Structure formats: structure tokens, C-alpha cells
Amino acid sequence: MKTIFTVGAVVLATCLLSGCVNEQKVNQLASNVQTLNAKIARLEQDMKALRPQIYAAKSEANRANTRLDAQDYFDCLRCLRMYAE
């Protein structure tokens, strides 16, 4: 009995759902998917092209931070010497 009910429910659901979607809507959604895939591909190319610039900027920022940290360290040493004298 459960099997017959399950099969009947599946057949009924299939019949009902097949009438809910028209071909125009499916084609529009397929077109939207293609457009989005093209945009994703362009963005991936842009990211790949920018990656070397990002690494260069990070490297320069790290060098600048290292110089500033060293400068702060020596400034602190000078201050300590002044107060120690």
C-alpha cells in the first residue's frame, strides 16, 4: 500500500511540476547562467592579472613596516639613554 501511494505521489508531483515551468522562462534562466559564467571568467582573469601587483604592494608594505619598526626601536633606545643620564 505504501509503495502504491509513493508511486502515485511521485507521478502526481511530476505531472503538476511539469506544467509550472514554460520554455521561455527556462531559456531566460539558461541565458542568465551563461552571462554570469562569462562575468565570473572575466573576474577570474582580472584577479589573475592583479595578483603580481598585489604581491608587490604587500612586499613594499612589509619593507616599510620593518623600517618603521626599526626606527621606533632606535627612538626608544635614545629616549631611554636620555632619561638614564
From Swiss-Prot:
- Please give the PROSITE patterns that the UniProt record associates with this protein: PROKAR_LIPOPROTEIN
Quick check: keyword Methyltransferase in the entry? no
Quick one: signal sequence residues? 1-19
Its localization reads: Cell outer membrane
Which terms are listed as keywords in the entry? Cell outer membrane, Lipoprotein, Membrane, Palmitate, Peptidoglycan-anchor, Signal
Lipidated positions (N-palmitoyl cysteine) are 20
| Name the UniProt record assigns to this protein | Uncharacterized lipoprotein YqhH
Look up and give the organism this protein is from. Escherichia coli (strain K12)
